[in-house]
Design a protein with these regions (language model features):
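Bacterial Sec-dependent N-terminal signal peptides
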Residues: 1-22
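N-terminal cap/lid segment of alpha/beta-hydrolase-fold proteins
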Residues: 19-47
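Short beta-strand element of the alpha/beta-hydrolase
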Residues: 48-59
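Alpha/beta-hydrolase active-site loop
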Residues: 105-131
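Primarily recognizes the serine-hydrolase "nucleophile elbow" in alpha/beta-hydrolase
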Residues: 124-195
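The feature captures the conserved acid-bearing segment of alpha/beta-hydrolase catalytic domains
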Residues: 165-236
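C-terminal catalytic histidine-bearing segment of alpha/beta-hydrolase fold enzymes
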Residues: 234-319
Length: 319
């Protein structure tokens, strides 16, 4: 496949910056724990906005919805006219002592399922209050970093396979944004009964913590971004955009939402708000010099696949 080397990603989305109103709500109580979400709302005159629901990272054993880096990301999202939501979810691996891989697999399954349940509850809370929160119910996206990205991808996977009962039967996510995520399998065949939402995959090609390819034994394990793209999205002509960070590891879980917000906004614009017949070719992008990736007209829908090279200077900035 042809590779085109470009040099920087700069802003694609130009909107007025809005003042932001941040409010905290309790959206559920489970296992004796109050689950809260922070709502970042643009203070504008629009009655409906797209909405991005975000789950933090931390290996299902640590992390918090209101960490400074997440606040900055969601504030920037809201400044561009998108309601941002950062949620709590129960941490299934917190304080757990794992003795072997079999025990780890069982606890991980419980952890992923709990996180998905909590993300679904947060989305339902947003849907139930869509008028008050000025959210367009048809433009709700989910996102996350690392464990949160697994949660987002898994939530859409479960929804497509009829495993989500808390949301309206005809509900579909408008998009999924994954910062170093994967889909988990716990013994079943990996398949989607309904077409998934458009996905923005960001992943380091050498990520071994949340695999870029797949780590599966007897149908148990993780299917990473590259495996999902090559074996499902490409074969089924499903809409996606991929940013592959060459020779990077799991630091992309943070680099993505800290350094690549313009690409997030580009994805939302092209795939969620204004889907068209644009095909984004397989591109290698370095950090310096160009305003946007090469866009080519296509006939089969909106797809994207970019390979990103980021300088060591950027790596230092995300630490």
């Amino acid at each position: 496949m042809k590779r085109i080397i470009l040099t920087a990603i700069s802003a694609f989305w130009v909107l007025s910056s809005f003042a932001i109103n941040k409010t905290t709500y309790t959206f559920a109580e489970k296992d004796g724990q109050e689950l809260k979400l922070d709502l970042y709302m643009p203070e504008d005159t629009l009655q409906e906005h797209p909405c991005l629901v975000f789950a933090f990272g931390g290996g299902f054993k640590m992390g918090a919805r209101d960490e400074e880096s997440y606040q900055k990301f969601l504030t920037e999202i809201a400044e561009n006219g998108i309601v941002g939501v950062s949620l709590d979810y129960r941490l299934g691996l917190k304080d757990k002592k794992v003795k072997n891989l079999i025990q780890l697999a069982k606890i991980l399954e419980i952890s992923v399922n709990m996180a998905v349940e909590d993300m679904v509850s947060a989305v339902k809370f947003v849907l139930d209050n869509a008028t008050e929160f000025k959210v367009n119910p048809k433009q709700i996206m989910i996102s996350g970093s690392s464990a949160g990205a697994i949660t987002a991808l898994q939530t859409d996977y479960f929804l497509c396979n009829g495993k989500v009962k808390e949301l309206p039967q005809d509900f579909r996510f408008a998009g999924v944004i994954s910062f170093a995520g994967a889909v988990a399998s716990f013994g079943e065949k990996l398949e989607y009964k309904h077409q998934p939402a458009p996905v923005l995959f960001m992943h380091g090609t050498k990520d071994e913590l949340v695999t870029y390819n797949k780590k599966v034994v007897l149908k148990r394990g993780m299917y990473g971004s590259n495996y999902l793209i090559e074996n499902l999205w490409v074969k089924n002509n499903w809409p996606y955009m991929a940013l592959r960070f060459r020779d990077f590891g799991h630091e992309v879980a943070m680099l993505g939402f800290k350094e690549q917000v313009p690409m997030v906004l580009e994805f939302i614009d092209k795939f969620v708000l204004n889907p068209s017949k644009i095909y984004v070719s397989d591109i290698t992008i370095a950090e310096q010099g160009v305003n946007e990736p090469l866009l080519q007209l296509g006939t089969d829908g909106l797809y994207g696949d970019a390979e990103v090279i980021i300088s060591e200077e950027v790596v230092e900035r995300i630490k």
